[in-house]
Design a protein with these regions (language model features):
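ABC ATPase NBD Q-loop/coupling interface
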Residues: 59-75, 143
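ABC ATPase C-loop
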Residues: 159-160
């Protein structure tokens, strides 16, 4: 599904990613861990198409098709979703209107007509119920006045509505108390299927108690230095990252 091949990328002439290779298949959950400054958020930004970063070598393929020439919105239309560590506030635009616009822009890019209002409303209600989201939440301005947990739940709701092929969750556990973390993780688990894949980027093992990965990769100094299963995350929790240098 997603194939990252010998990816080198950086910003302002400084190389940050130094040859990343990663194969993510449909139905899989991959966790990417590593110390601060390892390149985790850079990797997610580069896959999503952040234009502040320059790819100098390698490729990113989605279902065999290179994404490198695609703008961020084109990658989103093709099925790449990224939840941000610090979601932006958009006063005056409700959660529902934002979702409506995002879905219809994606459909337009695929040559499809706008989703009928009744169908959209039905889908919103179904996904909100699935994720235990209060309907009043959907009429609020996007992220304005939201708590950390509400912002993250909103992003998982967007993921539910957009149904991406690959969802990249960047530090989704950042700033969440244990109850909010559990709610967000349960939402992600409910959205997993054999048709999509999830990449979880995290500094801490605790998120992986709730979103259990098939594979764990350790990023250090712009390279994947070790890969394994859930047990690797537990080992990192006990030993830290220094033993991998």
């Amino acid at each position: 599904m997603l194939s990252i091949q010998n990816l080198h990328a950086g910003v302002d002439g400084k190389e940050i990613l130094k040859g990343i290779n990663l194969e993510v298949k449909a139905g899989e959950v991959h966790a990417i861990m590593g110390p601060n400054g390892a390149g985790k958020s850079t990797l997610s930004s580069v896959v999503a198409g952040n234009e502040n970063f320059e790819v100098t070598k390698g490729d990113i393929l989605l279902n065999g098709e290179s994404l490198l020439e695609d703008a961020p919105e084109e990658r989103a239309h093709k099925g790449i979703f990224m939840s941000f560590q610090y979601p932006v506030e958009i006063p005056g635009i409700s959660v529902t209107n934002f979702i409506k616009t995002a879905i219809n822009e994606s459909r337009k890019a695929q040559g499809l007509p706008e989703m009928p209002a009744a169908e959209l409303l039905k889908k919103i209600r179904e996904k909100a119920a699935l994720l235990e989201i209060n309907p009043n939440f959907l009429s609020r301005s996007l992220n304005q006045g939201f708590s950390g947990g509400e912002k993250k739940r909103n992003e998982i709701f967007q993921m539910a509505m957009l149904e991406p092929k690959v969802a990249i969750l960047d530090e989704t556990d950042s700033g969440l108390d244990i109850d909010a973390l559990r709610i967000v993780a349960n939402g992600v688990n409910k959205l997993k299927s054999s048709d999509n894949a999830v990449i979880v980027i995290t500094h801490y093992q605790r998120l992986l108690d709730y979103i259990v990965p098939d594979y764990v990769h350790v990023l250090h100094d712009g390279k994947i230095v070790k890969s394994g299963t859930k047990e690797l995350a537990l080992e990192l929790e006990q030993k830290g990252y220094d033993w991998l240098k």
